[in-house]
Amino acid sequence: MAKLNVNPTRMELSKLKKRLTTSTRSHKLLKDKQDELMRQFINLVKYNNKLRKEVEDNLQGSLKDFVMARAVMSSEFLEEAIVYPKEHISVEVGEKNVMSVSVPVMNFKRQLEGDEGSIYPYGFANTSSELDDTLSKLYEILPQLLELAEVEKSCQLMANEIESTRRRVNALEYMTIPQLQETIKYIRMRLDENERSATTRLMKVKSMIEQRG
């Protein structure tokens, strides 16, 4: 590892030792952060996979019901039944902090038209129970869909932060800290050499003075 280009003085040695202490402490903190991020990320990915499977299974069930509804209803009645939604939905996206990562938090409000509280935007005279089942399941799936979007975005952001933290940890571990250690070692060696040279000169001067005396 190449050393830093600095003057081999005691002042520089003191500065570098402080930098090494700070870098070592930063490395430990970042490594701890990386480990905790990985732990939370793995848990979130497991939950994301479970939630995605539930959503996909529920959507598959809704699709089967819709196919059955199309089979027993005319296209005209089917289109008229679902063209005007009964429900209005608004979504508010906020943030929360997870290990210095800002991840999204989605809150949504649902408002049904009319006072009866029915989710079906049609009467039941010309529709089928399969269509009722389709809309009922989709109504229940919506919160899961929004949660899935929130969780998957959180996974993406945490993965980015893990990669960024990993690069910083590696830079400290394999470049900054070894460079500082090598430079400190070099300065100490040079200072020791200078001290030995100074001692040798003093001994020679002392010897010369004694001989003249």
Swiss-Prot record:
It comes from the Bacteria. Keywords: ATP synthesis, Hydrogen ion transport, Ion transport, Transport. GO terms for molecular function: ATP binding; proton-transporting ATP synthase activity, rotational mechanism; proton-transporting ATPase activity, rotational mechanism. The keyword Transport applies. One of its GO terms (biological process) is proton motive force-driven plasma membrane ATP synthesis. It holds the Pfam family ATP-synt_D. HAMAP family: ATP_synth_D_arch. This is V-type ATP synthase subunit D. It comes from Clostridium botulinum (strain Eklund 17B / Type B). The lineage of its organism: Bacteria, Bacillati, Bacillota, Clostridia, Eubacteriales. The gene is atpD.
